């Protein structure tokens, strides 16, 4: 059991965001990403109403990577719940029979959505904003589960610096790899609040160029923190040298 972005939509009074880009409203979860192991048969997440005065409704559901609501593989229980001021409630994620149809050799990505609904107001000319957030939910089959005390390592991600200074990440692992930092001296080159996700057994390129031959990357780990690596690329279009950085937070 382990304790994940870029959807920002303002429409019909709904603000949808990710954990990294816009602060949560009254309702907050106990983590920023969700890992569901097949052997656990399910997972639980706690929601807390931070408001000291107002009750809120919290609506939860699962979406696939195309933004379609799905109850075929995982469902949330309860799908709607009331949280009184300062109250904490547990939401369960339960697998369905069709979960057996998912690939056994790699992770499958879903999104856990939570929408907070404030109480109605009697005041006139007041627009209420409903906060909606999506957390990455990674379904991890038994064949690739980590031990309880296991820590993900990222040496199998091949890094190549190309002629124009852009970086290619070849993910040779069965896990989704998300980069939350690419840069030097603590200054990231990633656009503000954005990350770069590489699908299992796939690759992704940076949109920015002119990356120096020596830099650092920070992978977002299972716990939502960053695991840092030192990257040294003595030549272009060849694999760079990768070593664990001294810091890991």
Regions found by a protein language model. Give the residues of each.
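Beta-sheet-dominated interaction scaffolds and their linkers
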Residues: 24-48, 147-161
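Short acidic, flexible loop segments centered on an aromatic residue
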Residues: 52-68, 172-189
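Bacterial N-terminal signal peptides
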Residues: 12-20
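Buried hydrophobic-core signal for structured, non-transmembrane domains
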Residues: 43-49, 93, 110-115, 165-171
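Intrinsically disordered, low-complexity Pro/Gly/Ser/Thr-rich segments with frequent PxxP/GP/PP motifs
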Residues: 71-100, 188-214
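Bacterial N-terminal signal peptides that target proteins for export
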Residues: 1-11
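N-terminal targeting signals for Sec/Tat export/insertion, comprising classic cleavable signal peptides
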Residues: 32-70
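Terminal connector regions
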Residues: 98-144, 214-249
């Amino acid at each position: 059991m382990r304790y994940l972005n870029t959807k920002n939509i303002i429409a019909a009074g709904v603000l949808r965001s990710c954990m990294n880009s816009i602060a949560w409203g009254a309702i907050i979860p106990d983590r920023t990403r969700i890992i569901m192991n097949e052997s656990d048969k399910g997972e639980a997440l706690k929601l807390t109403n931070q408001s000291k005065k107002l009750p809120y409704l919290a609506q939860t559901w699962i979406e696939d990577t195309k933004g379609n609501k799905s109850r075929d593989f995982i469902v949330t229980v309860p799908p709607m719940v009331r949280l009184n001021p300062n109250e904490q409630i547990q939401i369960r994620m339960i697998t369905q029979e069709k979960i057996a149809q998912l690939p056994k050799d790699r992770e499958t990505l879903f999104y856990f959505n939570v929408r907070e609904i404030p109480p109605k107001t009697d005041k006139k000319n007041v627009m209420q904003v409903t906060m909606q957030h999506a957390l990455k939910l990674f379904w991890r089959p038994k064949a690739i589960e980590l031990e309880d005390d296991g820590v993900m390592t990222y040496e199998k991600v091949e890094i190549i610096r190309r002629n124009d200074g852009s970086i290619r990440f070849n993910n040779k692992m069965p896990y989704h790899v998300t980069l939350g930092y690419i840069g030097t001296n603590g200054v990231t080159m990633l656009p503000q609040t954005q990350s770069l996700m590489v699908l299992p057994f796939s690759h992704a390129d940076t949109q920015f160029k002119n990356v120096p031959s020596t830099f650092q990357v920070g992978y977002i780990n299972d716990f939502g923190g960053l695991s840092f690596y030192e990257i040294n690329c003595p030549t272009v279009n060849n694999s760079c040298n990768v070593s664990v950085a001294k810091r890991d937070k």
